[in-house]
Every structure is written in C-alpha cells, then in structure tokens.
Curated annotation (Swiss-Prot):
SMART domains: KH (SM00322), S1 (SM00316). Keywords: Cytoplasm, Magnesium, Metal-binding, Nucleotidyltransferase, RNA-binding, Transferase. The lineage of its organism: Bacteria, Pseudomonadati, Pseudomonadota, Gammaproteobacteria, Enterobacterales. This is Polyribonucleotide nucleotidyltransferase. Pfam families: KH_1, PNPase, RNase_PH, RNase_PH_C, S1. The gene is pnp. It comes from Serratia proteamaculans (strain 568). GO terms for cellular component: cytosol. Belongs to the polyribonucleotide nucleotidyltransferase family.
C-alpha cells in the first residue's frame, strides 16, 4: 500500500502542498508540489560515483511543460511535445542557478533534476512551484546538498509588496521579481521592473526572502520524516604538501601575470606558467595526478586575484574598484538597417541592430499559460570568435537565450505602447568581443539602436555588471567586472535602468553572509556606474530620431466601420489579396475596424488608403457610378461599382427599348455608367444603365475598380 507523506501549508494567498513516497520510487528522490491546482512533479537522480577524470560538476536541470496539464493537445504535426521552448529553457536556468552553489566544491558526481508540469492553474505560474520541488527533492535525496532553499515571486502593487501574485495581479504590478535562498542567505534574484528605485528593489528582495522561510521550515520537517540517509561521501583530503609546493612555484609568477592588462596576452602567460609548474612537478614525481595539480593551480590563481582586490590594490586591468572601462559609442554604423549601434566597453563589444516590422511580424507564442503575441523581440548571439576561440555555430544555447531575455527585460519598460507606435520591433545583439558583461553591453547597444531607428523609447537605458569579493568582514564591491572577476568573485549582479530607476536586476550569490548592507552598497555603486555610462551614451544620441529610416515600412492607420470589414477582406480573402498585390503594401485589419497599411513608399500607402475608402464608402441611391460588367446572365448583368460591390442591372434597365439578348448590348469587362435605383435590407443593389444614360442624368462618379 502506497502511503504518501505530505506537508500542506499556507504560502501567501495560496495553499502549497509537498508530497513524497507515491511516485517514481526508483529515482533517488521524487516530490509532487502543488500550489492551487498548479502541480509540478520533480525527480532527482544522483550517481553514487563520479566518472574517472571528471573535472567539473555535471548537474543537469530539465524543466518540461506537458500540454495535458492545461487540458490541451500539442498543435505540432506529430501532436506531441518537442524541443524545449524558450520559456522552458529560462525556467531550467532559474532552477539551476540557486541550487548549483549549494553542492560541495569537490562533489563531481552526476546529478539530474527533472521538473515536469502535470497540472496548470493559469493564475499560478509553475516556475516557483518547480523551484520549491527541486529544493525538496534534493533535500530528501541524501545527496550532499547544503539546502534546502525557498523561492518566492514578489510583485509591487499600489506601493505594497505582494507575495506570489497571480497572473492577473502581475499585469497591474510594476515589479516581477523572483528570489531564492537558504534560511540565512539570498542566492539568486531575477527581475524586471517599471523603473523602481534601489531601495524599492532591495526591499522586494528582503521581503521575498523573509516570506519564503515557511517553505524551508516545511521542507526540513518533511526531510526529518521521509528523508533518505545522507550519502557516505567525503571530500577528498587536501594534499597540503603538494598545495604548498604549487603555491611556492606559481604564486609569485601568477601575481606578475595578473599585472598584464590585455586579456589574450594575460591568458597566454597564465597558461604558460601553469604548464611550467605541471612539468616541473611531474619531473620530480611522475606519480602525481595532473588534474589534482591543475585544481590546486586554479585555487592559487583565485587566491592571488582575490587577495589583491581585498588589499585595495589595482584590479587585473589596473582600474580602481569603482572605475568603468573606456567607452566608445557609435550609432548609424550600418547603412541599410533601420537602426544600429556599436557599443564598446573595454574588451567587450556589441554590434546591435533594430528592425521595424508590422503586426504580421510579431511572434505568436502558444505557451502553456495561454496564447500571447510578442511585438518586441530581443535576440542575443555569442559567436566563438568573440573570445578568440573556434566552435560550433548554430541554434542559440541556454546561455544566449538567458542573456537575451535579461537584456530584453532591461529595455522593455521603456518601449512605447502599441497604440503610440504600432510596429513590431526586433533587436539583435551580436557580441563581437567579450571580456565580461556582454548582456549589459547589449542593453546599452539596444537603447542606442532603438533611438537611431526612431523608436520613441521613454528614456535611454544602460546596464552594468557588478562583482563582490568577501573574506570574513572585509569586502570590496567591483564595478564593471571582467570575465575573470566574475569567475573568481563571490557575487555577480547585473543592473539595468534609466536615470530615474531600475528596469532589470539579476543577482547570483555564491556564498552566505551577503547582508542587506552589502547589497545596498553594491546597488548604490551600480547606480553611479549606470549614470556615468548614460552620460557617455547621451553624447552620441540623446533622444530618438525624429523619423524612422527610409528603408523601414511606414504604418498608416485609418478606421473603418466594423460592418465593412467583410467588404475589405472579401470572400476567402480575395479582395484584400488583390489590394495587397495592386498597391504593393501590407494591410492588416483588426476587429474594431482599425486598418494598418504598411509601405516603404508613401504614394503606395496613399493609393491603398484611397482604395479602402472607396470599398467602404456607402452606396448612395440616385448616384451614378462608373462600373464594370463582371457577369452576364439571362435576366441581366452584374456590374461592379464602388470598389468591389456588385449590383444587378435587370434586362429591362439596360436600354430604353426592349432587349431580347443581353450580350447584344453588353460584354464581359465592359465599362458602363450605372445609376443606383435601390439598396434593399439585405444589401443587394439594383442598378440601371437606362437611367444613367438618359439626357437628364449627370456625369458618373469616378470608377472604383
């Protein structure tokens, strides 16, 4: 008999349930976590032994959404789920980031976490549920893991923080922040905001961390009852003698190498030193393990850099702690793109373009939470040449998707409303050089490219990456970190925003003991850096250009009577297709009668507007039109008037004498003047050639084909 072990408690406005012992009993651990009908099944499997020669921690997190969770069948050809969507990839990263630092440094056994969404309440996003599930499953598994963690989403509505807001509440919120951490420390923050202050953002982080303590308490309670025995795993003993010998051979030389400011030259020197040390030690003792020597070298290298920073010495490239690298900002660098910019910060460089399209170019997203249309696209590309390497070039990797989403969050709050700027906008950031903070360079480049394209963004946006080095009570916050400082530091966080406030914040903390005060110092230092970068950017371009590129489609908007939409579209889309071909424009019609005509040529747009106005014009009884014969039948002829509308000329109305055969008087395609006699309740039009050609008749209205 299967007996589940359950913890059920109130979490904000929702009831959270964590259940184990019922399913997937061959996995190392498994839990079902539900929050008001949104349920995620999370499993963990860990290998008891590490693979020989394993040099990194092989943790894999897979988050997958099943359409049956929302009572739907996949719309793909094979009617089953395929490769992960962008949303699934981002959630996988969201789960991975706070749990990865909680495994011991020397633990190299393979661990896989799989989170499957099996039931969905559209008001409750499954990402928080999945994060809690991963924490619970790892804590139950017995695998070496310094958790559990809690997770919370924080909104900001009417100047109040809201815990785990619903989907509807998030639409009204000026903040969407996810925070995860242990009982004593914040580990991860991911957020987008509608221009909030540093204090408001920090308050949200602290609020979310305080509220999630109930989750941690209940996971600990569940582990006490149902947790598996802790693995008998011991960290490998440190070879103190070897460590001292490596430090003696390498420490001073590595210190000298880290005075080289140019990245590639420094890397070459560091690699040469490491190779020399390995060769020297192996020459003395062939039985030594090369990978062990390399691990110790990495530790010595890390200590060299961190010690310099903590002593207040200049950083790797000679800067002080709060200095920004040299900036070079250019706009309009590509002649045919709608907007472009080249943003360079030290050895990090982004070529960013902005392209304008119509509503037809928007991305339709069929997500589990519901369908939506995205008219602002942001794509980030990180080719191998940007770091002087060779490698595969193809579809975007998880990192590129994550960095693109972060950069998009930084700019999103500044984008104009669709009714003010009815274009689909695509921004692409090509990272051409990288030495730290390429995602924030993408934010700066995007702001410049959008202004260059004439997109009326509300304000310029800049981004900056910050780092932290901390030993006991001594800490140093670094502005505009290099790649090495990111790798060797204890925290990296990225802040994007305008002069008025923050639009995006991403924080990853690798150690405990980061207090509110430290985060406050870091955020304030980031503000100074952001304002400095904005000042340089504004020298290149301070406001959006007054007009869009001559190569961009111009969208003209008119309104028609919604009852006339069917006339413009025609049977099976025949009229609108003909209009598009005839005028060389793109025409989009909304249900409320809004018509958008897009064309790169202004005259073509005017022609399309005139044709639509002709089609939608009301037919006036008694008025004479120039028409074209479209069909001939025994009892008369059908004549097209007023841009696609047809009326019947009865055989008795063709001439002022008896007509035996219609074709004796009329031919297909013949142009004839006709007078409107009547429009009945069903919209049928009765016409007369006889009365239109009578001596007292006036001149016909212009022809509308």
């Amino acid at each position: 008999m299967l007996t589940p072990i359950i913890r059920k408690f109130q979490y904000g406005q929702h009831t959270l349930t964590i259940e184990t012992g019922m399913m997937a009993r061959q996995a190392t651990a498994a839990v079902m976590v539900s929050m008001d009908d949104t349920a995620v099944f999370v499993t963990v499997v860990g290998q008891k032994k590490a693979k020989p020669g394993q040099s990194f921690f092989p943790l894999t997190v897979n988050y997958q959404e099943r359409t049956y969770a929302a009572g739907r069948i996949p719309g793909s050809f094979f009617r089953r789920e395929g490769r992960p969507s962008e949303g699934e990839t981002l959630t996988s990263r969201l789960i991975d980031r706070p749990i990865r630092p909680l495994f011991p440094d020397s633990f190299l056994n393979e661990v896989q976490v799989i989170a499957t969404v099996v039931s969905l309440n559209p008001q409750v996003n499954p990402d928080i549920v999945a994060m809690i599930g991963a924490s619970a499953a790892l804590s139950l598994s017995g695998i070496p893991f310094n958790g559990p963690i809690g997770s919370a989403r924080v909104g900001y509505i009417n100047n109040q923080y809201v815990l785990n807001p619903t989907s509807d509440e998030l639409k009204e919120s000026s903040l969407d922040l996810v925070v995860a951490g242990t009982a004593g420390a914040v580990l991860m923050v991911e957020s987008e905001a509608d221009v909030l202050s540093e204090d408001q953002m920090l308050g949200a982080v602290v609020f979310g961390h305080e509220q999630q303590q109930i989750v941690i308490e209940n996971i600990n309670s569940l582990v006490a009852e149902a947790g598996k025995a802790k693995w008998d795993w011991q960290a490998p003993a440190v070879n103190e003698a070897l460590h001292a010998r490596v430090a003696e051979l390498a420490e001073g030389r590595l210190g000298d190498a880290y005075h080289i400011t140019e990245k590639q030259e420094r890397y070459a020197q560091v690699d040469a030193i490491k190779s020399s040390v390995v060769e020297t030690l192996l020459a003395q003792d062939e039985t030594l393990d090369v990978s062990e020597i390399q691990d110790i070298l990495g530790s010595v290298e890390k200590n060299v850099v961190r010690s310099r920073v903590l002593r207040g010495e200049p950083r790797i490239d000679g800067r002080e702690k709060d200095m920004i690298r040299g900036l070079d900002v250019r706009t309009g660098v590509l002649p045919r793109t709608h907007g472009s910019a080249l943003f360079t910060r030290g050895e990090t460089q982004a070529l960013v373009t902005a392209t304008l399209g119509t509503a037809r170019d928007a991305q339709n997203l069929d997500e589990l939470m519901g369908e939506k249309t995205d008219s602002f696209l942001f794509h980030y590309n990180f080719p191998p040449y940007s770091v002087g390497e060779t490698g595969m070039v193809g579809s975007p990797k998880r990192r590129e998707i994550g960095h693109g989403r972060l950069a998009k969050r930084g700019v999103l709050a500044m984008m104009p409303k669709p009714e003010d700027f009815p274009y689909t906008v695509r921004v692409v950031s090509e990272i051409t050089e990288s030495n730290g903070s390429s995602s924030m360079a993408s934010v700066c480049g995007a702001s410049l490219a959008l202004m260059d394209a004439g997109v009326p963004i509300k304000a310029a946006v800049a981004g900056i990456a910050m780092g932290l080095v901390k030993e006991q009570d001594n800490f140093v916050v670094l502005s505009d970190i290099l790649g090495d400082e990111d790798h060797l530091g204890d925290m990296d966080f990225k802040v994007a925003g305008s002069r008025d406030g923050i639009t995006a914040l991403q924080m990853d903390i690798k150690i405990e003991g980061i207090t509110r005060e430290i985060m406050q110092v870091a955020l304030n230092q980031a503000k100074g850096a952001r304002l400095h970068i904005l000042g340089v950017m504004e020298q290149a371009i301070s406001t959006p250009r007054g007009d869009i590129s001559q190569f961009a489609p111009r969208i003209h908007t008119i309104r028609i009577n919604p009852d006339k939409i069917k006339d413009v579209i025609g049977k099976g889309g025949s009229v609108i297709r003909a209009l598009t071909e005839e005028t060389g424009t793109t025409i989009e019609i909304e249900d409320d009668g809004t018509v958008k005509i897009a064309a790169t040529d202004g005259e073509k747009a005017k022609f399309a507007i005139r044709r639509i106005e002709e089609i939608t014009a009301e037919i006036e009884v008694g008025r004479i039109y120039q028409g074209k014969v479209t069909r001939i039948v025994d009892f008369g002829a059908f004549v097209a008037i007023g841009g696609g509308k047809e009326g019947l000329v009865h055989i008795s109305q063709i001439a002022d004498k008896r007509v035996e055969k219609v074709t004796d008087y009329l031919q297909m395609g013949q142009e004839v003047p006709v007078k409107v006699l009547e429009v009945d309740r069903q919209g049928r039009v009765r016409l007369s050639i006889k009365e239109a050609t009578a001596p007292e008749a006036g001149s016909p209205a212009p022809e509308a084909e």
